[in-house]
Curated annotation (Swiss-Prot):
Residues 23-42 bind DNA. It is found in: Plastid, Chloroplast. The lineage of its organism: Eukaryota, Rhodophyta, Florideophyceae, Rhodymeniophycidae, Gracilariales. Gene3D superfamilies: 3.40.190.290, Winged helix-like DNA-binding domain superfamily/Winged helix DNA-binding domain (1.10.10.10). Residues 6-63 form the HTH lysR-type domain. GO terms for molecular function: DNA-binding transcription factor activity; transcription cis-regulatory region binding. One of its GO terms (cellular component) is chloroplast. The gene is rbcR. InterPro entries: LysR_subst-bd (IPR005119), Tscrpt_reg_HTH_LysR (IPR000847), WH-like_DNA-bd_sf (IPR036388), WH_DNA-bd_sf (IPR036390). Belongs to the LysR transcriptional regulatory family. Transmembrane segments: none annotated. Trans-acting transcriptional regulator of RuBisCO genes (rbcL and rbcS) expression. Keywords: Chloroplast, DNA-binding, Plastid, Transcription, Transcription regulation. The keyword Membrane does not apply. This is Probable RuBisCO transcriptional regulator.
Amino acid sequence: MRDLPFTLDQLRILKAIVKEGSFKRAADSLYVSQPAISLQIQNLEKQLNIPLFERSNKKATLTEAGNLLLRYGGRILALCEETCRALEDVQNLQGGNLVIGASQTTGTYLMPRLIGLFRQRYPQVNVQLQVHSTRLISWSVANGQVDLAVIGGEVPNELKDTLQVTSYAEDELALILPTSHVFSKLPDIQKEDLYRLRFIALDTQSTIRKVIDKILIQHDIDSSRFKIEMELNSIEAIKNAVQSGLGAAFVSVSAIAKELELGILHWAKIENVTIKRMLSIIINPNRYKSKAAETFSKEILTLFVTPAA
């Protein structure tokens, strides 16, 4: 068996340099000196007998060989981390890490409650929550950076053969209005009334907006005719804008529980129209699933949201 021309530490250093963009910042992130970083890279290039970085510019730019080593090195480091976690599982949830991913709305309003309950039951497990777009979270699960995730949209087409997607629960979306709006006095509104409203919306690339547009079309409602007053980048900003009387909006019911209880927002029902999306749990079946992830799936995820029949 041949000796390896690199060490795990050298692979970590290479990854850090690319991530941080320079030798100095990589050294700071690894809590070592810059000369030590440079020496490790010089030794690595000598062992491989090939340059890994372009020496013609100040930025840390990889050569073709450097990119190749980075790609395979990342997989090696991920497998080492996976091995360590598998060994930790021998301790039966007496420690270890659990990284959970979620898309924006789910990660903001549902997952913190579930993670809080899990920590009460298993305080020894270190739980991290990553909240990003459905696309970014899907890639994190595929790459092994996240154990499992709950998302509200579809995984990217290029990952559908990689990820296992399981329907989890229905998430109803509500049309919210200021309590002072004339429509808030009605038991429900008609489809045609939607075209008279001014809307506060997420940007056109958001998962929720795409789902809403798709479902409205199924009910013969053309969302392209809506008067969009403004586009905001967070649900909290949208709720505040609606509460201030700036317009109407569609948001997840899970995001407005407190506001409905306090009576500061109105949930307007549309006659014969119900807008729901399916939340999904995604995992990478080709990667090791820790006992912490298995326990979270079986004990916690089923507690707050009842799956659709």
